[in-house]
Regions:
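Motif-centric detector for short Cys/His coordination patterns
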Residues: 1-90
């Protein structure tokens, strides 16, 4: 049995602690311990990037975005976790 205080619960958006690339898959370790991965080919700009360019991913905005400076590409971590991709799977 749960007891409700009547106070709204604040939703916590997923945030990244770190990000890395293996081959053409980008992995993100989230603050809650989960690790999610997605193929670079699900985003237009990343699909055209080299593996070396993909490997230069940075975690930005307190963990709420991934940034590829050289590619001028930003992807939100909550969007990744929710499965919001630009392109369908191949």
């Amino acid at each position: 049995m749960s007891i409700s205080t009547g106070e709204p619960r604040l939703a916590v958006e997923p945030a990244a602690l770190r990000a890395w690339v293996e081959g053409r898959t980008i992995y993100v370790e989230l603050h809650d311990g989960r690790i999610v991965g997605f193929p670079a080919d699900r985003f237009r700009i990343l699909a055209a990037a080299t593996e070396e360019q993909l490997a230069r991913v940075q975690v930005e905005l307190n963990g709420y975005a991934l940034r590829w400076e050289e590619l001028d590409e930003d992807i939100t971590v909550p969007g990744i976790v929710a499965g919001h991709f630009q392109l369908p799977p191949k």
